[in-house]
Amino acid sequence: SEKIASHTERLHLVVKTAGILKDESVGVRPEKKLADLTRSKLEKVFSVNCFGPFLWYAALGHLIRHREALVVATLSARIASVGDNRLGGWHSYRASKTAQNMLTKNLSLELSRTNPRAVIVGLHPGTVDTGLSKPFQKGVPSNKLFSPEQSAAYLWDVLNTLTPERTGQVIAWDGQTIIP
């Protein structure tokens, strides 16, 4: 944050894209059953998907605490929706993204108290044809498997239509609100 602060006094758009679903080098992969969970794997996934983004936002401090237009977006996932969970599994990923969504909501409430123009959201990019989703693309219809460029374009469109009324929400690539 110090390096960023040396270049600007305020940020108006922050998009945090770091995330982990699997990392074979440390044995992290989506769990099919609760017995597959370990503390170290759970901590690794939470560290990247939840703790990292929000500790970074906290470190940004005054750069995002102003009264000008502000959008802070963190990549989330539809799979984090408690109300939409019909399959179970993927415990650490789902839980970390659900916790991320709660922190998104909390940050939105905190910043809106002093900046009614702040919009803090989670963004669901859809299923993107990357190494992260490769092993899990089997049942995805071809029109719902996006190239990284296509997903980025959809999310850019969403970012450009956000209003303060959407703050605290998780929004899909097509602009639809995802139920918590």
Which residue stretches match the model-derived regions?
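Conserved Rossmann-fold cofactor-binding substructure of NAD(P)-dependent oxidoreductases
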Residues: 1-10
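Hydrophobic structural elements of the Rossmann-like NAD(P)H-binding subdomain
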Residues: 15, 73, 120-123, 133
